[in-house]
């Protein structure tokens, strides 16, 4: 292998592991390992992790949970073949399935639909009261995330482009620090960081409002093509536990909040308030034509992702949009709806 190729490979692997933490408690060397990438936004993913449902249902596997700060980082880890499953937003997925990334993974679950749990917040004292007043201002957001996508959509709705503002690529915790120091004037981010931003700022627009205007964003669970082909039984178990978590959010929100709180270091009451800001589907809705669809019949989520890809291309974030067929082929419908609704 040429030196340049070796360096490139090492660089990708290093990026995949940057800014993430790993939970490998209980690993045994004689078992295969399932590698799951998660993020700290409130979702059923954190309930599954905290409750150790996968460890219980898959005793012959090690379960390796790795925390990532954004969907862009999750994409990088998939490219480096460091993940089997990963939680990331619809915009990173749309980017990942489009050229030049062309990541070989499939959308296998809808974790949540962004509502008031993602928002554009202007800092108190910045003098900004409307999106139009952001012209020339510094705005922090994690690049290639759903928040970045929503920010571009919000700017576009108000006659602005990325060239009219100063975009700063920051992860959520870095956004909070820069916001509090006054280094940035506004930020588009998600929970739990978002609630901290709101203590010293005000919402200009939320992702719930953008969804009503035709620019919805989602948090999704993806599985690598290679893993899905080799271990469809594990994919079924994983989907069933995610469906179980959604049921818990609906049926026993206090228990759901307690499990999530233990993972992100907040009180159950704080998490309970945050859960009310998102939109959590039922398993039946996840497997409906509006979202994933049924076996052999990919749902409307493919249209949503293609629309996001087209928007990213229009904003010159990617070279060109992928066709609808690309996204339909990337929806994992095996066994739906029964696989997650029984």
Residue ranges and their predicted role:
Residues 1-33, 338-342:
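Short, low-complexity disordered leader/linker segments with a strong preference
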Residues 27-161, 166-169, 185:
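Short, glycine-/small- and polar/acidic-enriched structural segments
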Residues 47, 67, 71, 86, ...:
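Solvent-exposed, acidic/flexible segments
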Residues 57, 77, 81, 95-99, ...:
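Structured segments of extracytoplasmic/periplasmic soluble domains
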Residues 63, 162-165, 265-277, 319-326:
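Short, surface-exposed acidic
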Residues 91-92, 168, 173-265:
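Pocket-lining segment of extracytoplasmic ligand-binding domains
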Residues 230-314:
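Secondary-structure end/capping motifs
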Residues 304-342:
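Conserved C-terminal helix/tail region of periplasmic/extracytoplasmic solute-binding proteins
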């Amino acid at each position: 292998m040429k030196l340049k190729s070796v360096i490139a490979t090492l660089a990708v692997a290093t990026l995949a592991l940057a800014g993430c933490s790993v939970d490998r408690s209980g690993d045994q060397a004689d078992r295969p390992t399932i590698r799951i990438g998660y993020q700290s936004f409130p979702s059923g993913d954190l309930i599954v992790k905290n409750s150790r449902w996968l460890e219980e249902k898959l005793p012959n596997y090690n379960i390796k949970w790795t925390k990532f700060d954004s969907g862009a980082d999750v994409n990088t880890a998939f490219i480096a073949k460091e993940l089997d499953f990963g939680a990331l937003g619809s915009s990173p997925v749309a980017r990942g399935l489009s050229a030049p990334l062309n990541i070989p993974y499939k959308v296998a679950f809808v974790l949540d639909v962004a509502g008031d749990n993602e928002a554009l917040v202007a800092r108190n004292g910045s003098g900004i009261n409307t999106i139009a007043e952001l012209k020339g201002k510094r705005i922090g957001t994690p690049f290639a995330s759903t928040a970045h996508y929503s920010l571009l959509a919000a700017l576009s709705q108000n006659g602005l482009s990325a060239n009219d503002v100063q975009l700063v690529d920051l992860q959520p915790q870095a956004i909070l620090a820069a916001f509090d120091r006054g280094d940035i004037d506004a930020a588009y981010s998600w929970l739990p960081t978002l609630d901290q931003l709101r203590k010293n700022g005000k919402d200009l627009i939320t992702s719930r409002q953008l969804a009503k205007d035709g620019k919805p964003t989602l948090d999704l669970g993806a599985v690598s093509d290679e893993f899905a082909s080799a271990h469809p039984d594990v994919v079924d178990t994983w989907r069933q536990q995610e469906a179980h978590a959604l049921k818990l959010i609906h049926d026993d929100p206090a228990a759901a909040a307690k499990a999530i709180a233990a993972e992100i270091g907040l009180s159950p009451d704080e998490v309970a308030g945050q859960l009310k800001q998102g939109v959590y589907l039922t398993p039946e809705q996840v497997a409906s034509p509006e979202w994933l669809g049924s076996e052999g019949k990919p749902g409307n989520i493919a249209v949503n992702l293609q629309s996001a890809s087209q928007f990213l291309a229009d904003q010159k974030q990617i070279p060109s949009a992928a066709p609808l067929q690309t996204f339909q082929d990337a929806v994992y419908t095996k066994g739906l709806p029964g696989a997650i609704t029984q």
